[in-house]
């Protein structure tokens, strides 16, 4: 073994720890201490691992919380418990009340703020193999083991949800410990994620860790066909056959009818900007429109709601625009974000420049529930494909003139739509309904049932 191989092996051991002895018990009915059945042995008993769950205000928390809430199963959950994020605000006050248990495991990063930024930049492996939540894995495993013993809950299927990808490292340990079928759900790519800062050794280790998860999981779930192709192309055909696509979802019951009374035409973007995902293509397009016709945006209000780095807030392309044309707003609670969507005339999806983007943002799926026209400033890929099927305007962020033309047309169409006294919800209902949580949760339920049928467990 070479020195380089030894370093990689040591790094992986430090991330994973010693393997756990595999249990031989599979699909046995749960018993209370007195021997009476506590849980229905004929039902799906799911153990879910998701660091991010409501009330944390992460898109992942909202999406996975919604999916678990709509699953017809007995569910025990292990999740994170930190003060690093705002709360969803109005997602569902009763979330988690139907769970068998919710084990919230406290985690506080060792470094925060500027020291953490420096460490990410200069310290090898810091928060990169796979992420800053790695120390949470063993704490969560210990807490979960105790909770399973206390409740006598014996799960017959394990589901892990990443991001963060440390959830899947916990999945590896639980798969070895419990010996039950395992579904690994990826909301984003892991080792191939273009938003990950490239560092050779960390990337190599992440590829090895991802490979272990893909090899040991019984099913792999991703949120777009493009992600499936990217992730699974490097694996044997037998592993690829374990993978499938399950989209994000929206809940139509959470939206309210528009209540606006002002006369301005509102164009909104809701979501965070970071990395290469930037509002600059929008700013440049607005400048092109104003240069061609200074009056063309009269009566138009543009709002960007969410976090934005200072380098983008101070960008010269924004400073070149008239004061008051673009309003920057901080992140709002989830329920309020849905209200803002419904009270918009045009919603924006913006992604970073790329030859092919595998990302299908959950915010885009939330937009579908609002029934409001959408403009995509996105490269070719998952978002562009969906928007094209919906006959939305789409422009590549690398082409300022194309973005300006699409924006001009989308605003004109939105203005015309406002004049209609009884506008129907925007979007082909046959396509939009495929992202309704009722249909998405039913598809996931079938996936779980099929897996358990293949492995000898209950399918209800």
Which role fits each region the language model picked out?
Residues 277, 333-339, 347-368, 374-385:
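Nucleotide-sugar-dependent
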Residues 178-181, 191-212, 252:
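Nucleotide-sugar donor phosphate/pyrophosphate-binding loop at the beta->alpha transition
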Residues 226, 246-249:
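Carbohydrate-associated surface elements
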Residues 12-17, 21-27, 31-105, 289, ...:
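N-terminal subdomain of nucleotide-sugar transferases
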Residues 398-402, 415-450:
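A charged, aromatic-enriched C-terminal amphipathic alpha-helix characteristic of glycosyltransferases
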Residues 299, 304-338:
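Nucleotide-activated donor-binding/catalytic signature segment of Leloir-type glycosyltransferases, i.e.
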Residues 47, 259-277, 283-286, 440:
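Conserved donor-binding/catalytic core segment of Leloir-type glycosyltransferases
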Residues 166-169, 173, 201-220:
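Membrane-proximal helix-turn-helix segments that form the acceptor-binding/catalytic region
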């Amino acid at each position: 073994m070479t020195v380089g191989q030894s370093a990689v092996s040591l790094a992986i051991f430090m991330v994973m720890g010693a393997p756990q002895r595999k249990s031989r018990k599979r699909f046995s009915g749960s018993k209370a201490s007195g021997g009476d059945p506590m849980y229905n042995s004929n039902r799906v008993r799911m153990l879910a691992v998701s660091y991010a769950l409501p009330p944390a205000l992460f898109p992942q928390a909202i999406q996975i919380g919604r999916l678990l809430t709509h699953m017809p199963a007995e569910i025990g959950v292990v999740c994170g418990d930190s003060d690093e994020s705002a709360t969803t605000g109005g997602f569902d006050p009763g979330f988690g009340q139907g769970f068998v248990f919710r084990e919230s495991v406290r985690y506080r990063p060792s470094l925060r703020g500027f020291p953490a930024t420096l460490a990410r930049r200069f310290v090898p492996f810091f928060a990169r193999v796979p992420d800053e939540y790695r120390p949470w894995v063993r704490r969560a495993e210990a807490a979960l083991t105790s909770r399973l013993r206390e409740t006598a809950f014996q799960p017959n299927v394990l589901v892990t949800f990443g991001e963060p990808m440390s959830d899947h490292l916990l999945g590896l340990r639980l798969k070895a410990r419990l010996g039950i079928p395992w579904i690994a759900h990826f909301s984003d790519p892991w080792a191939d994620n273009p938003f990950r800062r490239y560092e050779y050794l960390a990337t190599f280790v992440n590829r090895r860790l991802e490979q272990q998860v893909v090899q040991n999981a019984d099913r792999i779930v991703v949120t777009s066909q493009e992600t499936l192709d990217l992730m699974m192309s490097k694996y044997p055909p037998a592993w690829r056959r374990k993978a499938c696509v399950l989209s994000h979802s929206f809940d139509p019951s959470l939206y309210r009818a528009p209540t606006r009374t002002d006369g301005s035409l509102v164009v909104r973007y809701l979501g965070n900007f970071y990395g290469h995902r930037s509002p600059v293509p929008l700013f440049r397009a607005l400048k092109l429109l104003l240069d061609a016709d200074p009056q063309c945006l009269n009566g138009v209000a543009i709002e960007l709601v969410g976090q934005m780095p200072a380098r983008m807030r101070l960008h010269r392309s924004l400073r070149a625009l008239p004061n008051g044309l673009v309003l920057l707003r901080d992140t709002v609670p989830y329920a309020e974000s849905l209200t803002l969507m419904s009270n918009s005339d045009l919603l924006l999806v913006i992604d970073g420049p790329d030859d092919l983007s595998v990302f299908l943002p959950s915010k885009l799926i939330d937009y579908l529930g609002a029934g409001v026209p959408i403009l995509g400033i996105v490269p070719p890929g998952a978002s562009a494909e969906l928007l094209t099927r919906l006959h939305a305007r789409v422009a590549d962020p690398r082409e300022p003139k194309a973005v300006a033309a699409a924006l001009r047309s989308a605003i004109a169409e939105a203005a015309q739509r406002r004049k209609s006294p009884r506008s129907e919800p925007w979007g082909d209902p046959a396509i939009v309904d495929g992202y309704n949580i009722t249909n998405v949760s039913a598809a996931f339920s079938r996936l779980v049932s099929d897996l358990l049928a293949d492995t000898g467990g209950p399918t209800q």
